[in-house]
Amino acid sequence: CYLFTATQQLDESLDVLLGMVTHPYFTEQTIAKEQGIIGQEIKMYDDSPDWRLITGLFECLYHEHPIRSDIAGTCESIAAITPEMLYDCCKAFYAPGNMVLAAAGNTSMEQILAACARHGLMDERPAEKVERLLRPEPMTLAAAEKTIAMPIAKSCFGLGFKEEPLPFGDLRSEMLYELILCCICGGMSPLYRRLYDEGLTNPGFGGEVLRVDGCCCILFTGESDRPDTVRQLLLDEIERVRKEGVDREIFTLCKNEKYGQLIENLENVEDSASQMADFALAGQTVAQQI
């Protein structure tokens, strides 16, 4: 996703953006420069406890899915990148049928369409058919647990649950996952208050749902000196909710909070544009999601 904001010269800025994605330019020299920068970023992430925790969870949850691999690659893999490889990727993916251009603010549809026309994005052209070849992924776990030793003040921990992949455009199920997580361990839940009051976790403890093509999982992460205790309390709460259901009052609060967040994003120009693009790529509109 490419983002920019502008207070003036919007047409010129759009021309730079659309020119970049429609007519990319790669050389051995520019690639070598970026390889050095990305290599430093990879090493930086290797020193991040939070990042190592998440990648460790993915390695435990999945046997074959590409989510096991660090999205940035490795210093060895990026060293093999060539201009021809990047041009092939652009030809396959940087096609109008795969693009979403979202704009918010003091502009008009006519101005945006004119920018697209200047770069040939309004011309009819056959779409490149790209098929992602994913290896079969069993629903079993690749590993039950993993420990990573790092020199940090307080230990990070994560607990993951592997779920069946969601169909494309099924934002309703994703929203239900988020509401259930809010009811189980959100800031208004009894479990969150207990863990925080007893000093078992940090304020950043929480759960999230992650879904990509062929992958869906629930992740709980935080900091704790007693991760095994937190894990058991979390499992006990999940089992209680399975048997008794969610508290109606907490569910209403969580639903209103989520609704409020969606509305609040419409008050911010940058958030509005990002939200429109995200939902469009998922096959829906902001209005449908709300």
Can you say where each PLM-predicted feature lies in the sequence?
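Double-stranded RNA-binding/processing signature
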Residues: 134, 138
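Helix-start/capping segments and mature chain N-termini
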Residues: 179-182
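Short glycine/threonine-rich loop/turn motifs
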Residues: 171
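Short amphipathic
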Residues: 5, 141-149
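Charge-rich, well-structured scaffold segments of protease-associated domains
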Residues: 1-130, 154-157, 163-168, 176, ...
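Short gly/ser/thr-rich secondary-structure transition/capping motifs
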Residues: 84, 140-141
